[in-house]
């Protein structure tokens, strides 16, 4: 899939990476449904987008695996990948379980309306199985996601929408309501009572805000959010049209991606994406980290004499401030927080519209799962 390239081949690949990047960002409305049929775009995806997308799905599987209820500890794991594309999410699942102590039999069902995507997904799974003793099978179904509710009903332990929800009903003014209704229908039909649904979307403001709106609709429909949210209230980020919520994971990219970054002026030194993990039961990340915790939902806001973040928890989204003069060994980790961290506090001052850290405040950053 990835081989040593000459300088000219690398330049050609970089040009295709730029072309694909534009289609996935600024020119999203021009993105053809079957864009991976284009050989150049397909090679750009495999070289530049597939590796980080593996890391994203594995990060979310770790969040599920961290739960004391051992949510992924099954002898057989049935996985439904909706809009599977070339099989990236399935490869991420295979790599995750092949590296772990618990190695279930994995039964994949992959749904995509592009035959070439299903073929690539099959080749990817077959290639992985040839180098691993992990027991896995794959069933492919050619169908759009919109037609998926008509598939034979089977209870799946894991349902995945990876970078696909934003591509359906894209030009429809009622896209949020239609996406919400479709996801809710699919979860009601296909998600096991103790199963999980992972939804990954780009970190762009438009796609991330759309996902937050779908999140609110799913909560209203009775689906609890396992992660990243630490509360089930309406998402406060939607109150301001300039706000959105996304994850940002540190990442050391492989050499090829570093070379492509130099040629394209793009950056893959961290992994930005929006996501939801949805379940039917009431299990959440608070079972892992405790009830009174917050999620960091901004970059550090540094100004003269202080550092601030936005954090989100049971009371919604608020600014939290620590003045430099109040730094102590008990709260010094505050200055090293990153977007996405889960954090707890002792002796935190609640000023109503914001929180304040004093010399007496203890800051406890939870280990990233």
Regions flagged by a language model, labelled:
Residues 258-369:
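C-terminal lobe and adjacent flexible extensions of AdoMet/dcAdoMet transferase-like proteins
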Residues 157-176:
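A short SAM/SAH-binding and catalytic strip from SAM-dependent methyltransferases
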Residues 1-31:
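N-terminal auxiliary segments of SAM/dcSAM-dependent transferases
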Residues 86-102:
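Conserved SAM-binding loop of SAM-dependent methyltransferases across substrates and taxa
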Residues 120-150:
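S-adenosyl-L-methionine
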Residues 177-194:
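A short glycine-rich, Lys/Arg-flanked "PGG" loop and its adjoining helix->strand segment in the class I
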Residues 193-201:
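Conserved beta-strand signature within the Rossmann-like core of class I S-adenosyl-L-methionine
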Residues 31-67:
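Class I SAM-dependent methyltransferase Rossmann-like catalytic core
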